[in-house]
Amino acid sequence: LFVPMDGEDQQTEIPSSFLALYADARQRLREPLAVVRQRYELCEDLAQLLTGQALGLSQSGTVSDQEVLQRCLAGLRNADSGLSAAEAGWAVQRLAELLGWGWPEPGPQPD
């Protein structure tokens, strides 16, 4: 994936898995890098913020780790979340990584 970099844009490395959400068939970004970076930071922050809540639900013993992730995904796919379906899937995948929980790799998600 070709991503032009300038001085300020090198501060935060965006994972290729997130860049792929915004890449066209020729592996070029469909949005300006600044927009993609902002969306990445939002999704990463959400995943980080959800770790405590997800861990608490899981440790309560009433729901499985997978159910917790499914609930998070459903919430983030809600139109009020401000995320696209693909971003929601990425954020939950990242949440699972942060918690060390298994989660299937997300496929292409319709918006």
Task: Identify the residue ranges that each predicted region occupies.
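Charged, amphipathic alpha-helical regulatory modules used
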Residues: 1-111
